[in-house]
Amino acid sequence: MKKRVFAMLMACVMAFSLVACGSKTDSGTAGGDTGSAETIKLGGVGPLTGGYANYGLSVQHGAELAVKEINEAGGVGGKQLELSFQDSQGDPESAVAAYGKLMDWGMNVCLGGVLSGETASVVAAANADDMFIMETTGSADKCIDGNDKAFRVCFYDSYQGTAAADYLKDNGLADEVGVLYQSDNDYSAGLYNAFVAEAEKSGMTIKETQTFTAATATDFSTQVNTLVASGVKVVFIPFYAEEASTFLTQAKGKFADDVYFFGCDGLDGILGKVSQDVTIADNVLMMTPFAADSTDPKVHAFVEAYKATYNATPDQFAADAYDAVYAVKAAVEAANGSTSGADLAAVMTSVTVEGVTGTMTWNADGNTSKAASAILYKNGVGTLFGQDSAADTAADAAEGTDAGAADAQA
């Protein structure tokens, strides 16, 4: 996928610079070296400013927390981890200059990009540097194509789209579905294509399909009216929270109360986008490998540590990044301390990581598969689908108390 044309590849190499995690520029070892005597340098790239900054900051924070924990526990083979993260502003071209800074700094292992577009650029550039990539959240299928030293911890889009259709069918949520997707975005279009193929195979009907582009993402009135008129009970919305917040704001009060809006990992952070009225996100279902309210001890410890450090609840972007750093640790240990891209890639298919997003093993294509669940948002609270949220439980209790008081007065 990445070797389409030499000029494109060179453009990617320039855009790839956004893979770093800090602002230091320091000359050091090249990506294929085993690092300095005392440190292993990790670099990552993502949007720390702009409309997608919530994703980049989550990834940065999740990675920082893992680095801190690993270093406090003695590091990796006696070496400390050092992390640098660079701002891509969500732009693939900007992402490339950052990768160059990281290489000058002496990056040994790359955590890739955050958004799919910048990730593809980073992965292409790293191919020429013997750089091992443990991609955090770039999910488009093509993101890691053409680079046999690139692996990822996140869901990939065709898996997500297929799993989304299966989830709706298996949980009896819909036989007829409406779809709204962004036709000029690889992430959204990839999810849409995989979802439709699996939905049709499982006997579901795509009753209505609507599209939008980056240029039309401010006015969803036509799409809302058309989807409402279709009478569907589920609308599949495979796009990012930034655009979803606009759509849901304009859709509020138009659909019946029992209609669900089902999305994938790009919806994470939706509550922050509708903080002026969190009920805008009511009935949003988001597929995820991570639930912050999980009772799993590993997840609970991660959530509490993240809250204590950043005064916020981690989302799956933070969780994926946290797991990515631990995956790097496992790979370096399996490779007897080497950070060579070839050495790390050679051991990756034999590595198993018990992470906060699930148990992960990797195939030769660099992909991992993890169990998927869904979070339901209601009254500003997200809970695993099928469980009552704390907000609903409190509301139900209050209603019961009020009803009891009314009966007593009567």
What are the roles of these predicted feature ranges?
Residues 26-33, 54-61, 73-144, 212-218, ...:
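Beta-alpha junction/loop-to-helix N-cap segments that form part of ligand/metal-binding clefts
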Residues 251-322, 382, 388:
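Extracellular/periplasmic periplasmic-binding protein-like sensory domains
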Residues 309-318, 329-381:
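Segments of small-molecule ligand-sensing domains
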Residues 193-287:
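Extracellular/periplasmic bilobed ligand-binding domains
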Residues 150-211, 234:
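An alpha-beta-alpha
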Residues 102-114, 133-136, 178-181, 231-241, ...:
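Periplasmic-binding protein-like
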Residues 35-36, 40-64, 86-92, 115, ...:
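Extracytoplasmic "Venus flytrap"
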Residues 1-41, 72, 389-410:
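Short, low-complexity disordered leader/linker segments with a strong preference
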